[in-house]
Design a protein with these regions (language model features):
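Glycine/threonine-rich helix-loop capping motifs at alpha-helix boundaries
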Residues: 2, 11-39, 53-68, 87-94, ...
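Short beta-strand and adjoining strand-loop segment in the mid-core
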Residues: 5-12, 84, 172
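Conserved C-terminal structural/oligomerization subdomain of aldehyde/semialdehyde dehydrogenase
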Residues: 28, 72, 79-248
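Phosphate- and divalent-cation-binding pockets in alpha/beta enzyme and binding domains
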Residues: 15-16, 50, 137-140
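Flexible, acidic loop-helix segments that line cofactor/substrate-binding pockets
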Residues: 1-5, 21-53, 70-79, 96-101, ...
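Helix N-cap motif at beta-to-alpha junctions
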Residues: 11-13, 47, 111, 135
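Short beta-strand segments
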Residues: 7, 66-68, 130
Length: 248
C-alpha cells in the first residue's frame, strides 16, 4: 500500500520537511527494471491524471509544493515527479481520497490525541505506521489507529512475512489474506448437530404451549442466575419441566 498522508509533530516539522525534500530531490527516476532506478512510472495515463488533479487541488487549497509537482517528460509520458507538499490539512480533498502516486502531503499535529484523530479522519483504513523513540507510546498510539495493519518504526514488514494477516477497515475492503485469518477466508464453515435422544422431541419443537413458555423462562433463570449454587439448585425444577414437555 502507498503512503497517502504524513503527520509530523509541529515542533520538528520544519527540520523534518527540509530533510525530506533533500532526500526526494536525490531520487533517481526511470524504468523499474533498471537497478539504478529509485522510482518508476505510474501504471497508466488515467492514474497519472489523478495525481495531477490531486496536486492541483492541493495548490488551489493553499498547500505549497516544495519539489516535483508535474510530469517528468524526460523519463516518459506517465512518469510523475516525486512530490513533497507542505501545509496540507485534512480539509483538502486529496487528503480524503486515494492518490496512489509519488506525492507526500505533510500535515502537522501538536498532541498525541490530535495525531490519532487526524489519522482516523478518513474513510479508509488499510495500513499505517507510527514513528517514535518511545516504543510503549508507539504501541499505545498504534492500538488507537483504525487500520488493518499498523507498524511501529517499520513500513514493509507485512509484505515479507506471510504469517501476518493483510486487510483493511472501513472502505479499505473486507476480509483478510495471508496468515491464519487469510486461510480461514477460504474455509466453508459447516455446523453438524446430532440429537442423541432418538425420536424424543426437544422442548423447542413445534407445538408450543403456556407450559413450554414457562419452561424456557425457567431455563433462562437457571443458566443466567450468576451463581453456581443457585444454578445447581434450580436444575431439578428445570429438568422436571423438560421431561413433562417431552412426554406430552
Amino acid at each position: 500500500s502507498s503512503v497517502e498522508r504524513l503527520y509530523v509533530e509541529e515542533k520538528i516539522a520544519d527540520e523534518f520537511t527540509k530533510l525530506v525534500v533533500e532526500k526526494t530531490k536525490n531520487l533517481r527516476q526511470g524504468l523499474g527494471k533498471e537497478a539504478e532506478t529509485d522510482i518508476g512510472s505510474m501504471s497508466s495515463e488515467r492514474q497519472t491524471e489523478i495525481v495531477e488533479d490531486h496536486v492541483k487541488a492541493f495548490e488551489d487549497s493553499g498547500a505549497e509544493i516544495l519539489t516535483g509537482g508535474g510530469r517528468n517528460e524526460e523519463a516518459g509520458d506517465i512518469f510523475f515527479e516525486p512530490t513533497v507538499i507542505k501545509n496540507a490539512t485534512n480539509k483538502m480533498r486529496p487528503m480524503q481520497e486515494e492518490t496512489f502516486g509519488p506525492t507526500l502531503p505533510i500535515a502537522t499535529f501538536k498532541t498525541e490525541d490530535e495525531a490519532i484523530d487526524l489519522a482516523n479522519d478518513t474513510e479508509f483504513g488499510l495500513t499505517a505506521s507510527v514513528w517514535t523513540g518511545d516504543l510503549s507510546r508507539g504501541r499505545r498510539v498504534a492500538e488507537e489507529i483504525l487500520a488493518g495493519t499498523v507498524n511501529v518504526n517499520e513500513v514493509l514488514y507485512t509484505h515479507g512475512i506471510g504469517q501476518t494477516p493483510w486487510g483493511g477497515f472501513k472502505n479499505s475492503g473486507y476480509g483478510r489474506t495471508h496468515g491464519k485469518e487469510g486461510l480461514m477466508e477460504l474455509v466453508g464453515v459447516q455446523h453438524i448437530h446430532v440429537n442423541r435422544f432418538l425420536f424424543t422431541p426437544d422442548v423447542w419443537w413445534f407445538g408450543y404451549s403456556k407450559n413450554a413458555i414457562e419452561t424456557f423462562k425457567q431455563m433462562s433463570r437457571t443458566f443466567a442466575s450468576g451463581s453456581i449454587i443457585r444454578t445447581i439448585g434450580l436444575l431439578p425444577q428445570m429438568w422436571k419441566r423438560i421431561k413433562e414437555l417431552r412426554n406430552k
